[in-house]
Amino acid sequence: QVLIIYVVIKGIAMADVERGRELAATHCTRCHVVGDINPYGGIESTPSFIGMKRLADWERRYAEFYILPPHPALVRIEEVSAERDEERPAFVTEIVLTLDDVDAILAFVKTLPAQAP
């Protein structure tokens, strides 16, 4: 019975990791280098996902990324963030995520090495 629970939990966790990887590939690669997904992509001035893991508070930064600049101008979290102000110029397509999506991205980031291979 314990093994079955472990397998189910592990399966859910792996599903979150895979969903987080897909979300990161779709949205985060616009600006960041995200592991092996786009090793030569991203914007030069933005930190890579692996580089961020070197910071002592990396987990908090990923869990709360949507409140840290410049993300509030780009990302809206359903049922958390305010709607985009119509007066604000839309220089990029808004990214709309849920808190479950944020958790999935964090689950994926936890699988990345703290240093580039």
Residue locations for each model-derived region?
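Stable alpha-helical elements in mature extracytoplasmic
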Residues: 16, 23-24, 58-62, 101-105
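Electrostatic cytochrome c docking/interface patches
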Residues: 7-23
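Sec-exported extracytoplasmic/periplasmic mature domains
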Residues: 25, 29, 54, 67, ...
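Gly/Gly-Pro-rich "capping" loops immediately C-terminal to redox-active cysteine motifs
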Residues: 21, 35-68
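C-terminal capping alpha-helices of c-type cytochrome domains
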Residues: 80-117
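The canonical Cys-X-X-Cys-His
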Residues: 20, 24-35, 105-108
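Short glycine/proline-rich, acidic loop/turn segments that cap or connect secondary-structure elements
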Residues: 68-84
